[in-house]
Amino acid sequence: MKILVTGFDPFGGAHINPATEAIKLLPQQINGAEIITIQIPTVFRKSIDVLFRAIKKESPDMVICIGQAGGRYDITVERVAINVDDARIEDNEGNLPIDSPIFEDGAPAYFSDLPIKAMVQAMQAANIPASISNTAGTFVCNHLMYAALHYASQYQPDMKVGFIHIPYLVEQVVGKANTPSMNIQDIVRGLTVAIHAAIENKRDIKVQGGAIC
């Protein structure tokens, strides 16, 4: 089995992105699967081009994209991606799409086909704060997740796809009172456990993991 794991470059004036830092430290094999990592530009459309080239080159069985969700205190496994770009800030090339479909011919939304609840449960069992998220936002993270799921639906239906958001690193919140963060070691451990669970569980488990709002 081959798993492609992506991480974004820094954006929004930051000098670091925990997604890229974390994937650099992932083991080359997890649960018998080969782990291939690539950095993705935080740029609308270009991010998709880079991802699609990597998928065509590597032919992975699974794609897991990693992104930063500043303000979240835990590692969150995304449930769904929606077909809209609605940027609050510019991407790294100054693009600021508003209410634009990602793919004109795409479905309104795609659900991750990873075992998201099993992944969360495995991280929690390893004492890593984790939960399911029901929104990947409307910036480049959602853009990339949606594109990967759209690609799979059109060209590679056996390829599993999902997205994981991670908190700020500790060094990113210096001087930012009451801003949650997580150290890089726990992030890497959480991602490793989550990927292991994604490989292990061909179907998701039936446990509570929803939200009231």
Swiss-Prot record:
InterPro entries (alphabetical): Peptidase_C15, Peptidase_C15-like, Peptidase_C15-like_sf, PGP-I_bact-type, PGPEP1_Cys_AS, PGPEP1_Glu_AS
Q: Which PROSITE patterns match?
A: PYRASE_CYS, PYRASE_GLU
Q: What class of enzyme is it?
A: hydrolase
**Active-site feature positions:** 78, 141, 165
> What reaction(s) does this enzyme catalyze?
Release of an N-terminal pyroglutamyl group from a polypeptide, the second amino acid generally not being Pro
Cytoplasm among the record's keywords? yes
Gene3D superfamilies according to UniProt:
Peptidase C15, pyroglutamyl peptidase I-like (3.40.630.20)
**What Gene Ontology cellular-component terms does the record carry?**
cytosol
- Keywords assigned by UniProt, alphabetized: Cytoplasm, Hydrolase, Protease, Thiol protease
Instruction: Tell me, in one coarse class, where this protein mainly resides.
Output: cytoplasm
The processes (GO biological process) annotated in the record are:
proteolysis
Xref: SUPFAM superfamilies: Pyrrolidone carboxyl peptidase (pyroglutamate aminopeptidase)
* Protein EC: 3.4.19.3
Recorded hits in NCBIfam families, A to Z, give:
PRK13197.1, pyro_pdase
Q: How does it assemble?
A: Homotetramer.
Q: Which family does the record assign?
A: Belongs to the peptidase C15 family.
Q: What is this protein called?
A: Pyrrolidone-carboxylate peptidase
The species this protein belongs to is Alkaliphilus oremlandii (strain OhILAs) (Clostridium oremlandii (strain OhILAs))
